Amino acid sequence: MTAPKVGINGFGRIGRLVLRAAIEKGTCQVVAINDPFIDLDYMAYMLKYDSTHGRYAGDVSIKDGKLQVDGNSITVFAHRDPAEIPWATAAADYIVEATGVFTLKDKAAAHFKGGAKKVVISAPSKDAPMFVCGVNEAKYTPDLDIISNASCTTNCLAPLVKVIHEKYGIEEGLMTTVHATTATQKTVDGPSNKDWRGGRGRGRNIIPSSTGAAKAVGKVMPELNGKLTGMAFRVPTPDVSVVDLTVRLASETTYEDIKATMKAAADDSMKGIMKYTEDAVVSTDFIHDDASCIFDASAGIMLNSKFCKLVAWYDNEWGYSNRVVDLIAHISKVQ
């Protein structure tokens, strides 16, 4: 079966890393990129050099008005309106909507006017069905034309929650994500009418913030709807975040048994999605880790046989971008 042909709308952090991941994995072929704010020369530069993930190891060049990456010829568009992007001229069937702007179904549907067949939104969506690899991707059906890959935090939390809930049952839980800074934050204090704290300078503050990541687990695992919620602390690091899940279990257990359960999942049912470590790790140890969730066995604690705190790391850029590629590869095989 030939690799699905992919177009990327928005060549920001996720857009560029989805391209890297697609080429590295070889399961998807990126044939087109649309970004009205970046010209072709700058696009090549931004792909080649990355302050967090390092210089691109392959060949990046420009030929005949197209971006050339490791022998892949990629058509480049510069349209602000998704409805004007001629995806069909580049044979792009699967569109990664990575602008962060067109996250509602009616907005994302504009891609169909240019010939797209499926749209995967690389962000949470209020009305598009959300899928998390390793959790509920098997529920995807071919009639779904617009779907969401959820958020990077939900991609870390949901596999962790799935393993725990299936073994012990979850009565209720609170999640905190200590989250790396992102491009939407201010470098220095600036106006942010909807979120006053979010307008404070990202380089010198720990900033409490809201997140729908925990509630979103209820959308991919309906049996947990209403049982989880959470919040975030934005911290001045460029990449890698960590989930802190405090959870009340339905059945009694020990922390040693939880560790064994998580390790078994990482080695089997969640292989490729989840990893397990007992090492004395810190955040930079997971830069460019392609897992959705790395369970930190040495960081968790247990108050009693039904109440525990579980810790899991994730590269909120690279791990998530790999799941976007995996999700496209999966849905392309579902007929």
From Swiss-Prot:
Pathway: Carbohydrate degradation; glycolysis; pyruvate from D-glyceraldehyde 3-phosphate: step 1/5
EC number: 1.2.1.12
Active site: 152
Any GO MF annotation of the entry: glyceraldehyde-3-phosphate dehydrogenase (NAD+) (phosphorylating) activity
Major enzyme class: oxidoreductase
Catalysed reaction, written as an equation: D-glyceraldehyde 3-phosphate + phosphate + NAD(+) = (2R)-3-phospho-glyceroyl phosphate + NADH + H(+)
Residues binding D-glyceraldehyde 3-phosphate: 151-153, 182, 211-212, 234
Annotated positions for site Activates thiol group during catalysis: 179
Binding residues annotated for NAD(+), in chain numbering: 13-14, 35, 80, 316
Subcellular location: Cytoplasm
GO BP annotations listed: glucose metabolic process; glycolytic process
PROSITE patterns the UniProt entry points to: GAPDH
Gene3D superfamilies assigned to the protein according to its UniProt record, in alphabetical order: Dihydrodipicolinate Reductase, domain 2 (3.30.360.10), NAD(P)-binding Rossmann-like Domain (3.40.50.720)
Gene Ontology cellular-component annotations: cytosol
Presence of keyword Zinc: no
Keyword tags: Cytoplasm, Glycolysis, NAD, Oxidoreductase
Primary location recorded for the protein, binned into one broad class: cytoplasm
Similarity section: Belongs to the glyceraldehyde-3-phosphate dehydrogenase family.
UniProt-listed PANTHER family: GLYCERALDEHYDE 3-PHOSPHATE DEHYDROGENASE, GLYCERALDEHYDE-3-PHOSPHATE DEHYDROGENASE-RELATED
Subunit structure, interactors included: Homotetramer.
Protein name, per record: Glyceraldehyde-3-phosphate dehydrogenase, cytosolic
Species, as recorded: Chondrus crispus
